[in-house]
């Protein structure tokens, strides 16, 4: 899970309080947010680098994508982590794995940083994970077999296991260090509710594409919680070819969901992922929710081989009742007009034309 925000005049949200009601212990609609304006950070790239980028522009019919350096991304997460580490805090887990730097810290909340980028805060991680999991799990009839691609912290897994119909879950994550942390650090184990010790769970420490190249039984639900497409390598996780491959692992009435960044801060990335899934031959439904610790809303795409599977999902009541989703899912499928307009600019990300990481860097620059 992954979360990157746009840096230009970014608005940082801090949760100051929340109200409880009988239905919801933590209701995202009732957060009182304190909004703080942060001034722009100066980009110190020299002029020659800028000229080189201009020479490498990627053209599409409606959009010009200019490659930018990734060091300009996610400055606020790095600043936040430094401030935490400089003050009173508890380091719950710290390791440089073969793939990333992992920092699990505790102040008032528990926060996971991967390569200095915030992945979740325990204050509101349920908002993200319930939105990722429950719409699809509630819509697919009696899901028995579930595949989770990514999600090594076990938080999406926790939500999946709430469904009594589920008999078998395969979780695929590349980083064994993440899995070990999620299994053994008490604060994370408390968050994921011992999910990795459920007898229904099978963990596969390998690359998702490697797993998808192996024969397997079909799945009723597939949950894609890949990192954001910040690099060309990560962009390969969001190609039409890979989405088409994932679709072959679905049962006739199965569906998958893909985390897809922010339709507010990265609309070109968000809608391009949806467009790429559609080009793989699937029916797509798009939705989003506000995640306060991310400082923005976050978007997802549902997809299926059979259009009827997602019929009237907006009118769905979710059971088991999540703590943070509205009782009726309809609001999640509504977008502001300015966000919908960006849909017309959506691109196709394919193995022969990897462009999503360039869209991403362009939208995330400051």
UniProtKB/Swiss-Prot annotation:
Active site as annotated: 225 (proton acceptor)
Biased composition (Basic and acidic residues): 20-58
Keyword set includes Cell cycle: no
CDD domains: AdoMet_MTases (cd02440)
Gene Ontology MF terms in the entry: spermidine synthase activity; thermospermine synthase activity
Catalytic activity: S-adenosyl 3-(methylsulfanyl)propylamine + putrescine = S-methyl-5'-thioadenosine + spermidine + H(+)
Pfam families for the chain: Spermine_synth (PF01564)
Disulfide bonds, paired cysteine numbers: none
EC number annotated for this UniProt entry: 2.5.1.16
Domain named PABS: residues: 74-305
Annotated segments matching region Disordered: 20-61
A biological-process GO annotation: spermidine biosynthetic process
GO cellular component: cytoplasm
Keywords assigned by UniProt, alphabetized: Cytoplasm, Polyamine biosynthesis, Spermidine biosynthesis, Transferase
Residues reported to bind S-methyl-5'-thioadenosine: 100, 173, 207-208
Binding site for spermidine: 129, 153
Pathway recorded for this protein: Amine and polyamine biosynthesis; spermidine biosynthesis; spermidine from putrescine: step 1/1
InterPro entries, per database record: PABS (IPR030374), PABS_CS (IPR030373), SAM-dependent_MTases_sf (IPR029063), Spermi_synthase (IPR001045)
UniProt-annotated location(s): Cytoplasm
HAMAP family: Spermidine_synth
Family under the similarity heading: Belongs to the spermidine/spermine synthase family.
Function: Catalyzes the irreversible transfer of a propylamine group from the amino donor S-adenosylmethioninamine (decarboxy-AdoMet) to putrescine (1,4-diaminobutane) to yield spermidine.
Assembly behavior: Homodimer or homotetramer.
NCBIfam families xrefs: PRK01581.1
Protein's name according to its UniProt entry: Polyamine aminopropyltransferase 2
UniProt gene name: speE2
């Amino acid at each position: 899970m992954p979360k990157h925000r746009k840096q230009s005049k970014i608005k940082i949200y801090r949760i100051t309080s929340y109200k409880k009601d009988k239905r919801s212990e933590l209701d995202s609609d009732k957060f009182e947010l304190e909004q703080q304006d942060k001034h722009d950070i100066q980009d110190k790239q020299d002029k020659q680098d800028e000229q080189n980028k201009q020479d490498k522009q990627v053209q599409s019919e409606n959009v010009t994508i200019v490659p930018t350096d990734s060091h300009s991304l996610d400055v606020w997460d790095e600043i936040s982590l430094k401030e935490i580490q400089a003050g009173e805090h508890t380091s719950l887990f710290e390791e440089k794995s073969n793939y990333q730097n992992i920092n699990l810290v505790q102040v008032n909340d528990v926060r996971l940083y991967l390569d200095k980028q915030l992945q979740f805060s325990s204050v509101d991680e349920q908002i993200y994970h319930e939105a990722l999991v429950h719409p699809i799990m509630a819509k697919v009839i009696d899901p028995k077999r579930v595949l989770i691609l990514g999600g090594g912290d076990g938080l999406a897994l926790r939500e999946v296991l709430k469904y009594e119909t589920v008999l078998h879950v395969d979780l695929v994550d590349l980083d064994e260090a993440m899995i070990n942390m999620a299994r053994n650090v008490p604060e994370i184990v408390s968050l994921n509710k011992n999910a990795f010790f459920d007898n229904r769970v099978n963990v596969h420490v390998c690359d998702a594409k490697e797993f998808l190249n192996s024969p397997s039984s079909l799945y009723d639900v597939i949950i894609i919680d890949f990192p954001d497409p910040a690099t060309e390598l990560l962009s390969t996780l969001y190609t039409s070819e890979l989405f088409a491959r994932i679709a072959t692992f679905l049962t006739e009435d199965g569906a998958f969901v893909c985390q897809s960044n922010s339709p507010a801060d990265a609309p070109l990335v968000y809608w391009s992922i949806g467009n790429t899934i559609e080009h793989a031959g699937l029916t797509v439904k798009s939705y989003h929710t506000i995640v306060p610790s991310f400082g923005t809303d976050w978007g997802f795409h549902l997809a299926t081989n059979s259009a009827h599977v997602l019929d009237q999902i907006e009118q769905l009541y979710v059971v088991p009742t999540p703590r943070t989703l509205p009782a009726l899912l309809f609001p999640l499928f509504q977008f502001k007009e300015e966000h919908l307009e960006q849909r017309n600019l959506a691109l196709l990300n394919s193995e022969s034309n990897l462009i999503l990481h360039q869209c991403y860097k362009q939208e995330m620059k400051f």
